[in-house]
Structure formats: C-alpha cells, structure tokens
Amino acid sequence: MWERKKQRGYEKKLRNEDDEPIRLPNPMVGFGVPAEPCPVFHRTLPEAAVGPPYFYYENVALAPKGVWSTISRFLYDVEPEFVDSKYFCATARKRGYIHNLPIQNRFPLLPLPPLTIYEALPLTRKWWPSWDTRTKLNCIQTCVGSAKLTDRIRKALEEWDGVPPMSVQKYVLDECRKWNLVWVGRNKLAPLEPDEVEMLLGFPRNHTRGGGISRTDRYKSLGNSFQVDIFILFLSYFLNEVFPISDSIIHLNIFYLNC
C-alpha cells in the first residue's frame, strides 16, 4: 500500500513538473524577423541533424514544459526557434519551430502583409472608438464569438450616449481580445470573417471555401493552421536557391525536404 502511494506521489510530481510552462524569449523573434534589428545568429547543429534531409516541426509555443524537450529529443536534440507572427502580420501567434533549415540569408515574401488592424481591415477605422487601443489581434482560434455575445455588448454600449464608463470599457475590451472582435458599426462588434482570417494568416482569399467545408470547419482548419509568411521565411533559402516561389502552400505539421 505504501509503495503504491509513493509511486502515485512520484508520478504526480513528474506530471506537475511537466505541466510547468517553459520560459519563452522576449521579444519572440527567433533568428530574426523582417523590420526588426537583431544580431547575426550562428548555430551549431548536432552532426546527425545536418541536412539534407531537412525537417520542420511546428507547435504552440506555450506547450507544457516536458513537450518541447521531448520533441527535441526525438529530433536530434535541436533546440526550438520561437517566433510570434505579430512581426509578420496584424495578429499574434506564438509558435515554436524545431528544424534544421538554413538560417542564413533568410528573406520575407514581398510585399509584406499589413502589420496593424487598420492596415489589414481599413473599413473598421470609421467605427473604432478611441478607448479601444488595440493595434494587433490576438491569436486566431478555432471558434469565434457568438451573435448573442455581440448583441450583449451592443446593448451594454447603447446604455451610454458618449464614452462608456471604465467598467463597461473593460468588459468590452476583454471580450474583444478573447474573441478577436472588430468594430463594424456604431456600438457594433463582429467576429472576423473566414476570408479575413485567411488574409491575416497569409492564405489567398477563399482558400478554405467550398468543397463541402462548412463555415465552422473553415474556422477550425484556419485556427489549427500556420502563418504562411513565417513558413515562407523558413523556406526562403530553398525558394531562392532550389525551387521557384509558388502560390500553393502545402499544409503539413512535419515534412521532410530532400534536395
């Protein structure tokens, strides 16, 4: 009995250690991002990890502590590169990447995408209140805010003729940040449309439309997708030296590139 309790306590301790979040770099710019000054990085890969073949693995940055060490262990102990998509587009998306791709002479796909909400969604500027100081959207999720939620917000705002009190502002902004709501009219907020999410992530318009894919599934697939401009940055060496740039981007979590 004592041995079983001791074993359960040890297993619980291990789980608690693994559940501890990892410490992420700030700013989260990896080995360099467009328009951000950074030193020249050099890294030494383990001999077994030197390509070709080349590998690339992406996962959420805020994974439990044990996850990244486990992934690294199975991929030749290569350390992850952490990048936030807010340096590439108007939405934040903290991701980690374990890869053995070349990091020298990387370049972004041009033209650079819009980097602020106003640039990406210019029609929202007319209705954007001064007390909503967001310039970036939060991470794209697999679901969106409901019509009931936006209706509750509208009613809360319509109780006030001018600027609402701080308590109402806080309530509205908390929901805006949680669900990536944008202003589409006086006191009217709405979730992003699927084609707007596609644009923010770097996909062509209607990339997820049709073919039996429902609106809900479009949001889900985009929420689980990657940011194309970051993906292109990592592959830019090969796009420049080996392959021509293509509009077709293969959506994979892991791929091996033999060249």
Segments from the language model and where they lie:
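Conserved active-site and SAM-binding loop architecture
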Residues: 1-259
